[in-house]
């Protein structure tokens, strides 16, 4: 991550450990004889209730960092602890559980199911987590209300504005 900035909010002082703790994190890709250092020596701590923005020019390693933080990829070197657990020590099924229960993504293209309502799109992570239908409906509606879309729960993505689709994606990321 060359020439990249990490903008962080100023959370209230807390004695709790960081929920994200990276030390010397790096990722190298090898393609034939070419070695690409996509991420070099990143140190980052994120505390509970803290908001963080990862910014930088194209090719600076933002997506690589997000893939590592989201447990979609593994670092080539360094340490990444999520909730005090070293990610490198997790098995595939444990990583899948982390992605389903602890990490929410808002993708650039939102990745909403076109034929599903806003409510069903928000319910998806809860379905995968095995949450009962009643609780799933309640939690998804609550998440939609938190992003001011409770009144649009029965609309499909093509019936929503770009900003509304983005808020559905945010609700889906927050529902777990």
Model-inferred region functions:
Residues 16-176:
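ABC family nucleotide-binding domain
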Residues 1-16:
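Pre-NBD coupling/linker segments of ABC/ABC-like ATPases
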